[in-house]
């Protein structure tokens, strides 16, 4: 659950993987409210899984790694995501919220940054918190919430937040499956001048009373940047608070070390 760079793939629209049909527009806020209401009081508050991460260098050669990811909704309403980069006992990883991140090396804090994880409001927060909070957290994506189109994604009805024309394949945008009320695609930019990253969330499985995308693929300028394949997922179990502290990185009680 990380965002590496960013891109759009115009070929996707050309070959019909993504098609958009004009329909009566609604606001992005209304779409987020629909997502929230569909699972209010039902969505899981904890999640953990093993992630096979494949990254592609400038020459296209892949490198492989195993990450261990733990997510929880805190009592005060925050979504936290801990990513252990390799063996949790090595102490290397990142702790994310929607607006901040803390990088650890050898179990010591190496950096604290005012940039968060843009996935979190869309895969967890939207179902657990007031929509106004989700709107604030998504402001940094620069998705235009006043623009909405309806269409299809991989043969399923979808709503696209952030565009007003079927020809727009470059503006920041969020695609939401109409039946499941989950995000299936995002186009996001790190800076206004950089190409967007095209992020696909797929292979959804029903977990608890919600859903989990078990494969994420990211491309920039049509070239793969990172793919994520999830395994051994579980929801609804207790996660030790020690896994989510920002002043220390501890593997004590980590589910992957038991």
PLM features per residue range, with description:
Residues 1-11:
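Bacterial N-terminal signal peptides that target proteins for export
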Residues 12, 81-85, 171:
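Residue-level detection of beta-strand scaffold positions
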Residues 13-23:
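Hydrophobic h-region of N-terminal signal peptides that target proteins for export
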Residues 24-33, 43, 100-170, 190-196, ...:
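Flexible, processing/modification-adjacent segments and terminal tails
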Residues 28-110, 144-146:
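N-terminal mature ectodomain segment of secretory-pathway/periplasmic proteins
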Residues 52, 87, 150, 154-250:
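Gly/Pro-enriched, hydrophobic low-complexity segments
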Residues 69-73, 98-100, 116-120, 178-179, ...:
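A short, sequence-level motif marking secondary-structure junctions
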Residues 74-79, 102-105, 121-126, 184, ...:
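Short, surface-exposed linear segments at secondary-structure transitions and domain or protein termini
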